[in-house]
Design a protein with these regions (language model features):
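Helical (often loop-to-helix) elements that flank the catalytic cores of nucleotide-handling enzymes
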Residues: 84-97, 117-144, 171-180
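Histidine-centered divalent-metal-coordination microenvironment in nucleic-acid enzymes
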Residues: 75, 101-127, 160-163
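Alpha-helical protein-protein interaction elements
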Residues: 8-9, 130, 138, 155
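Active-site-adjacent loop/helix surface patches within enzyme catalytic domains
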Residues: 75-78, 87-94, 99-106
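Short, surface-exposed, polar/charged, turn-prone segments marking secondary-structure boundaries
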Residues: 103-105, 142-145
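DNA replication initiation on ssDNA origins
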Residues: 1-74, 80-90, 144, 149, ...
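Residue-level signal for secondary-structure boundary elements
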Residues: 20-21, 102, 139
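Short beta-strand
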Residues: 64-65, 102-109, 151-153
Length: 180
């Protein structure tokens, strides 16, 4: 994983989150109690921190929602057993829907993927709606083994994802996209 690979994500980099071995805080949200093991670090996410994450020394996560409630990426966190099949189905669906820029990253857990759909400066409400729509269309074609971020099921500060480990596949622009 290089710095250039991570630039594909356009992640919020004015702060980051470090995973702790213990619970950092407890929060009640929509009738549920959530326990957070990530501690917010109000320093810019730099290459040194990213390298420590890639080496496995620390676990770093990034926020998906910036301080102005805008979202750069809609992310599908796939936790199934067949990433190749999932990516193929998702790729076809995203092309059909007119999304031409998306990147799939491998996570620390083998077989799990983070599929970043690059939307750019999307309002939070629009991101929620697009995420639900994409998830519903995917669920019509295969068993649901993923979560979509950002999600309304979690507080804003819990809409974070671990930094990816390696690029699985990427797609940048295509002449056959119907929405060009």
């Amino acid at each position: 994983m290089t710095a250039m690979d991570l630039k594909l994500i356009k992640m919020v980099s004015d702060h980051y989150w470090i995973k702790s071995d213990t619970v950092v805080d407890k929060l009640s949200f929509k009738g549920r109690t959530l326990y957070n093991k990530y501690e917010k670090v109000n320093k810019p996410l730099n290459q040194q921190v990213i390298n420590q994450h890639i080496k496995g020394e620390i676990t770093v996560a990034h926020s998906l929602i910036n301080s102005r409630d805008k979202v750069e990426n809609i992310v599908i966190d796939y936790n199934g057993r067949d990433p190749q099949r999932f990516y193929h189905r998702a790729q076809l669906l995203l092309r059909e829907e007119g999304y031409i820029n998306f990147t799939a990253f491998e996570t620390k857990t083998e077989g799990h993927l983070h599929l970043y759909i690059h939307k750019g400066h999307t309002t939070l409400q629009e991101a929620y709606q697009l995420g639900k729509m994409i998830s519903m269309k995917l669920a019509a074609k295969m068993p649901k083994q993923w979560r979509v971020f950002p999600t309304q099921d979690l507080p804003l500060e819990y809409n974070i994802l671990n930094l990816p480990q390696a690029v699985y596949a990427k797609e940048r622009g295509a002449s056959w996209s119907k929405h060009m």
